[in-house]
Amino acid sequence: SDVYKRQVLKFGDFTLKSGRKSPFFMNAGAYVTGSQLKKLGEYYARAIHETYGDDFDVLFGPAYKGIPLGVVTAIAYSELYGKEVRYCSDRKEEKDHGADKGSFLGSKLKDGDRVIMIEDVTTSGKSMEETVPKVKGAADVTIVGLMVSLNRMEVGKGGEKCALDEIKDLYGFETAAIVSMADVVEHLYNKECQGKVVIDDTLKAAIDAYYEQY
């Protein structure tokens, strides 16, 4: 209900980056205040720790939304688990001047680094097509896995498996999410939040129809 109250998860009619029409939309960028971002970083840090453990060096958040995600998660990881991990993000436009010129923000990737990728959500896996070659091309690194906030649980571009499973099969690293859409529906169906039922029968039917299609 926290993500609903903060308008991070919205219900309605949305056209996604993939072109799909969806009855729900997840936007971790709606976390905008200090306390909200602190909590978001803790969500990611706990999920990463539970899924992947401590054997990694760098949190990589693809530009643009992944930049603050990498920063707040690195801070939270240090506070929660006492482990210093570096953060790195790519630049959309390469910087050609100054001490930090190049294609990346934050820490430089080094040979031997073990990297965990962070995104808010992935629908079709398209962003990984751009990000994975950049990360692999920067140094001899191992991508340990990907963590997203929400597993939308819809099929990826191949039309058979969900996007997270497609990414796992294509690139050979693990994928995970803080929550799945099934968790969200179970938690909010016929439940009141801020004086109204969040997912009523009509919205539940729209979500079910979406999953029949995708």
Walk through the language-model features, giving the residues of each.
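Short, small-residue-biased leader/transition segments that mark boundaries at the very start
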Residues: 3-4
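An N-terminal, well-structured beta->alpha segment
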Residues: 15-55
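Solvent-exposed alpha-helices and their adjacent loops that cap or buttress functional pockets
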Residues: 17, 106-111, 168-169
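Short helix-loop-beta connector
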Residues: 52-56, 109-112
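Short glycine-rich phosphate-binding loop at a beta-alpha junction
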Residues: 54-65
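Short, glycine/charge-rich flexible loops or terminal/linker lids adjacent to PRPP-binding catalytic cores
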Residues: 71-115, 129
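A contiguous pocket-lining binding segment that forms or flanks enzyme active sites
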Residues: 104-151
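PRPP-dependent phosphoribosyltransferase catalytic core
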Residues: 133, 137-214
